[in-house]
Amino acid sequence: MNPVYSPGSSGVPYANAKGIGYPAGFPMGYAAAAPAYSPNMYAGPNPAFQQELEHPAHVSSGVQMFMFGHAFSVARNGAIPSGYTPGTPYKVSCSPTSGTVPPYSSSPNPYQTAVYPVRSAYPQQNPYAQQGAYYTQPFYAAPPHVIHHTTVVQPNGMPATMYPAPIQSPRGNGVAMGMVAGTTMAMSAGTLLTSHYPSPVAPQVTMPTYRPPGTPTYSYVPPQW
């Protein structure tokens, strides 16, 4: 055995060589015996968990015996304690707080429809897109015979054709051109007063030259079949 470490026997106090003071209630020695085994989850006497499971004979149907299996049959025989007081049913209520059965709903979803989004056949706006930045035309899914090799249908969100929102032209505030609001004529530069304001000019649209129908410029190649 290791001479430095030798485990003490039960009931022998610890060797307090340095004289360290311990708080009241501190175990100054090994326990004389291990604590008694308790089948409860928490230590300490709890009369509600010490009772045996008691049920009339007509309660134990085949379905219940199938659900609980061996543990249920052993509990009925009194071999193991259960957490149920005598005279109370073993099943938990549907609503432990009120004890009432929740209302019937034809939907298998246990959540309310108004709280959660619902997938619909109509177009949905992307909630993360800027709502005022673009005008979107109504977007509907085409029938399958149109989609086939023809149209790419996007998922719910912003459609492919987006129109930029028009930018409002600045309003004139009655100030002379080139002047800053809140200043006088003497404070403004003469060049700014005399310089003309650039008027918007429409971009020149180039139209392709029209070629009258006639003999094409390329030579006619007869079919090869």
From Swiss-Prot:
Which Pfam family is an annotated match for this chain, by its short name? TCRP1
Give the location in the cell. Answer: Cytoplasm, Perinuclear region; Cell membrane; Cell projection, Axon
Asked if Membrane is a keyword of the record, the answer is yes
- All ranges on the Cytoplasmic side of the membrane: 1-58, 194-225
A GO cellular-component term linked to this record: perinuclear region of cytoplasm
- Location, primary (coarse class): cytoplasm
Q: Which residues cross the membrane?
A: 59-75, 174-193
| Keyword field | Cell membrane, Cell projection, Cytoplasm, Membrane, Transmembrane, Transmembrane helix
Which InterPro entries did the record assign?
FAM168A/MANI
Q: Which residues lie on this side of the membrane: Extracellular?
A: 76-173
Annotated membrane topology is: Multi-pass membrane protein
Q: State what this protein does.
A: Inhibitor of neuronal axonal outgrowth.
Q: Which family does it belong to?
A: Belongs to the FAM168 family.
Q: Could you tell me which PANTHER family the record lists for this protein?
A: MYELIN-ASSOCIATED NEURITE-OUTGROWTH INHIBITOR-RELATED
Q: What is this protein called?
A: Myelin-associated neurite-outgrowth inhibitor
